[in-house]
Every structure is written in structure tokens, then in C-alpha cells.
Amino acid sequence: MANLFDQLKEFTTIVADTGDVEAIKSVKPYDATTNPSLLLKASTIPQYAPLIDEAIAYAKSQSGDKAQQIEDAADKLAVLIGLEILKHIPGKISTEVDARLSFDTEAMVQKGRKLIKLYEDAGIAKDRVLIKLASTWEGIKAGEILEKEGINCNLTLLFSFAQARACAEAGVFLISPFVGRILDWYKAKTGETYTAETDPGVQSVRKIYAYYKEHGYKTVVMGASFRNTGEIIALAGCDRLTVSPNLLEELKATEGKLERVLVDNGVTKQRPPLLTEKEFRFDLNEDAMATEKLAEGIRGFVVDQNKLEKALAEKL
């Protein structure tokens, strides 16, 4: 009998959530995603030391200002790690915009353009890169602007239906609704244990997937942030799933029959009026879990971005 990983690949695009090239070589995903936390982890891998040196040399060549050098080195390192990963995948790499910019639309647009230029200068076409943005109102608006320039975006830290709806209406290429972090919040609040079927993170992605398909939105749904393989199996059929290498290996090692759960029935309904900024902010605020997790997620990425920049600053 085939393993779960091979069966899942038949109807869901598998994406590796890692900055580790060796892990990517092992699991052979189609796409890969990175974030500031994964880049910080990757920067400690010995084989990446030359990339750090290259990022430092690049930053020094661009500016004499220390603060600008640190920013340029961090951006260059993110792209250099992305370039290494692209050598081993046929699809796209997601590279994240500095989380400190999460409430500044123009700054996110500028950073997205800069990252794409760094990839293009290295010979990588922009259609192989997704710019990752936090799913704040400002991030979604930045995504809308970048998409119109032909720069595809991955809207991340997505915990609520309001965020998902606004992303679809903005016409972004892809969203990353989080599963495990939603489960974490409910477990902490209720003390309950959840099955894959009752998992609130799984239910959230299923609702978003169904809404997108029945309203004819082209935005790709890529479930993210998994705590166990049960959550992944419960979302079989989702457009894409981005999964850590350890859970991908677990799926490879497990044999059994995998049933497709999410299916696009091809029926489309009329779309509702566009969500206004006021409605978005109110709906997000009404959702305590999403409000807390979005804020926590941004703070966490900022902490790791600062750690990465501190390490780079010591080498400048």
C-alpha cells in the first residue's frame, strides 16, 4: 500500500516549511516557504556561513550607513537562502517581508519590490517568488498593489474568515491560513482535547476553502502551521499545504488509505459586496483568537528578525 505522502501529492501540492536545503532535498516538495524564524534557524547551519559572508559583503558595497547595511544584509540573506532552495524545487519560494512593517502599506510594497529585484538580479524570474506579507489590513492592501505589478503574494498569519475574505477580494495569489496556532489557542482557553474533525484550525481552513471555491475566487488556499499529521490528513485536497519536514517524513513513513476531503464542486454563487476597512477591523476585533494570534505572530517574527539582524550586525 502507498504511503500517505505519495497519496496526498495526487490532489494537493506539497510545500516544505523550512529554510534547510538538506531537508528539502530529502522530502522533495514542489514549493517552499520561509519566514524570519526559519531564516534565523537556517543562519546557524554551518553550510550557510558563506551565504552570510556574501550578504555582509553585499551590504557593505551598498551603503556606508550601519543601519542600512544591517537591513540590506538581512534582505540579501533571505534571498540567498531562497536561491539555494530554488535549486532543489520546481516551484516557488516564499520570502517574507520584515514583520516590523506590518502596519505600513507603502513600506511593505517597497520591500516587496526590493526583494523581487534581488531575485531578478540573481537571474530568478519573479514568477518563481511569492512575497510573504502579514494579513493585516495594510498587508492585504500592499498585496493588492504588488499583484497589479505582477508580483505574486502569500498572505500569512491568517487566522480569521475576515482576513481570508479581504485577501480574496484583493486578488492576492495565495493565502496561508494557520491551523496549529488556532488549535493551540482553543486548547489553552478550553482545556479540551480535539480530534482532527473537531480541530478549530481544520474547520477554519475548510470554511475558507469552501467559500473561495463557491464564489469563484482564484486565490490559492495553502493550509499552514500544523501540529500533527491528523490535521494534514483532514485537509487532503486543499490546494496546497505547507508542512514542516518532520511531519512530511512522518507521512512518508505511514501507510494506509488516504481519502480526499476537500473538493471543489464547481458550483459558484454571487459574490457579496466588498468588505470595507471598517468591517474588516470590526470583524477581526470580534474574533479574540485571531486578534491575539495575529498580534502574537507579528511580535514573534519581529523578535527573530531582531535576533538575526543582531547576529549580522556583529559581522559588519
UniProtKB/Swiss-Prot annotation:
Q: Where is the active site?
A: 132
Q: What class of enzyme is it?
A: transferase
Q: Which InterPro entries match?
A: Aldolase_TIM, TAL/FSA, Transaldolase_1, Transaldolase_AS
Q: Cite the EC number.
A: 2.2.1.2
Pathway involvement?
A: Carbohydrate degradation; pentose phosphate pathway; D-glyceraldehyde 3-phosphate and beta-D-fructose 6-phosphate from D-ribose 5-phosphate and D-xylulose 5-phosphate (non-oxidative stage): step 2/3
Q: What biological processes does GO assign it?
A: carbohydrate metabolic process; pentose-phosphate shunt
Which PROSITE patterns does the UniProt entry name for this protein? Answer: TRANSALDOLASE_1, TRANSALDOLASE_2
Q: Which GO terms describe its molecular function?
A: transaldolase activity
* Keyword Transferase belongs to the record: yes
Predominant localisation class: cytoplasm
Catalytic activity line of the entry: D-sedoheptulose 7-phosphate + D-glyceraldehyde 3-phosphate = D-erythrose 4-phosphate + beta-D-fructose 6-phosphate
Q: Which family does it belong to?
A: Belongs to the transaldolase family. Type 1 subfamily.
Subunit-level organization: Homodimer.
- Protein name, entry field: Transaldolase
Gene field: tal
